[in-house]
Amino acid sequence: MTDTSASCQTLGTEPSFGFGDRIGLATPGHVLAMQRSGHGILPIFPQQSIREMARTNRSPGDVLNDALNGMREAGWTGPTGGDADHLKTTDDADVTAAAGYSFFTIDPSDHVDEKADGYDEGTLRERFAEVEGELTWLGEYRGRKLTLETGAEIECTEEACLRAGVKYGRAINHAIELACHIAAVQGLAGRDYEIELSVDETDHPTTLAEHYIIADRCLTDGIRLISLAPRFVGDFEKGVDFRGNLEDLDRSLADHAALARQLGPYKLSLHSGSDKLAMYAMLARATRGCYHVKTAGTSYLEALRVAARHDQSLFRKIIAFSRERFETDRATYHLSATLDSAPPDAEISDPVELERQYLGLWCEVPVGEGFTGLGRQILHCTFGSVLTDPALGPLLRTLLEAHQETYTEVLADHFERQLDALQAGRATAD
């Protein structure tokens, strides 16, 4: 772990947890959760994707300064990273590097062929012929075999290599180019940095052979890869717990973690990590503490919980507005929710029932599990529209400033549960 600037540090392979804050007032609650339950886990308080910044009209500097100021005011004296999330272009990298971020998450999803998993052999070979000239390195992997400590065997057959090349080849090249650009920018500035690669935004899980080719190619090219976010089995939807077979996920996590140890070590990163309590212990146990978890939207939902408890009228206005925006704003998210997942606010007179339908109540959730109500997703994906609305955005911010203690406490309670689940998994791994 080394200093990168006056504020942000690189965190290495220590377990870490990213706290995204889309409003700029959540860090005191994040700090309190870390103080209560974060022992041995390193925080990343400034974390935001380029998409989130655009939707909330905030700059990289705004996000960084709000988090660092909140951190200091809350009495945090330990280290923090600074995650410039989902970077797609050199411009994205330049503006976040200049602001002082230390952790750069590369998102090459625009260069992934989402349909590759469904191609028959003929189509696969046709598509490969289109990219073959760009993938001069792929031939090195044909025929390679690897046995993991879990007993799983990885074989880079011709078909596996062709499919990986078509699906991820251009994405790998783009990621390497962007990582080299970041290295040059940070090198000229004399700042340390670390790279995360995100390949999780696909419909189908990342196979072990694909994980191997992606990571090995990046490491061979000298990329400072500190963490990788594969697409795991099951569904990792925004705002709710893991949806899928936990036994299948446990086996898959064990294999991916073993591969990360063997090649790196580098951390396995869990994106859309908010509220995935049912699988946090598995992640911590499988990785032996070498993990990173990203959260963001859940802190916005806890801001709405403050509205639910202190200004019912505002909460109802936000629900109605979010329902109007839902079909448009959901376009860039993988969600199961529909407008039928929760009744309109006008049909619910009881304030507690309204909070239950749209946010969930921890007192009703079994220990070791997270929220599952899909009403949360209606509010989750419409954050940008609410926060930039000329009426609702300022009203919500004013309310949070007036009730900062409530916001801090509901956030601390929320994240303590998540950190405790990770700690439990680490304890069984040790």
PLM regions: where:
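Active-site capping/gating regions of soluble enzymes
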Residues: 1-66, 70-74, 90-112, 117-119, ...
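Active-site-proximal, glycine-rich beta->alpha crossover segments in alpha/beta enzymes
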Residues: 115-172
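Short glycine-rich or small-residue beta-strand-to-loop segments that form or flank ligand, phosphate
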Residues: 194-201
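Hydrophobic "anchor" residues on beta-strands that sit immediately upstream
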Residues: 81, 196, 267
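Conserved, mostly hydrophobic/aromatic
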Residues: 85, 197, 271
